[in-house]
Amino acid sequence: SPTISITAPIDVLRKTWEQERARKQMVKNREFLNSLN
């Protein structure tokens, strides 16, 4: 149905955005830990 083709890209974008945010947070945490050493 047409609804799927509309909602699917939104779900993909949301997943991508959340993964990107999580990755940036991990990098930030790693840099913070490195700055403590």
UniProtKB/Swiss-Prot annotation:
Domain of life: Eukaryota
Any matching Pfam family: CRF
Record's GO cellular component terms: extracellular region
Location in or out of the cell: Secreted
Keywords of the record: Hormone, Secreted
GO molecular-function terms, A-Z: hormone activity
Chief subcellular location: secreted
InterPro entries: Corticotropin-releasing_fac_CS, CRF
Cited function: Stimulates fluid secretion by the Malpighian tubules. Increases cyclic AMP production.
Misc: Inhibited by antidiuretic factor A.
Family: Belongs to the sauvagine/corticotropin-releasing factor/urotensin I family.
UniProt name for this protein: Diuretic hormone 1
Organism: Tenebrio molitor
